[in-house]
């Protein structure tokens, strides 16, 4: 089986959705220079449709917060824009507004979040004790931007 995979870092994608995760297709300026939100949404839809990937890793996807669900927001985007990669999978949520979410075609793939860990490498929703400044004292490091691990 041959798969078509893509990665797309969409600058300011988050700003194209309201707090409930609905697209804001209007004439208000987007955060991109000299382009409206409607123009940016249309352009993104065109690009993603033409890529026509079985799965596309979206970097800087709509964030997930108490008000918004990034997975639902991306699935709405795919539905509105007629993109066959219409189901979304997120891993560990972060609070940096730079989520990584996989959009995929459920007719081709079955995807689930599958984080791994071992004693020397904790899961990315945990913390790591490591001597960062070589002072023989371990500091706790929390991961601010966890990768998305899927299978």
What is each model feature region?
Residues 1-99, 136:
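N-terminal, active-site-proximal structural segment of metallo-dependent hydrolase catalytic domains
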Residues 63-64, 69-151:
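Structured beta-strand-rich core segments of catalytic domains in phosphoester-bond hydrolases
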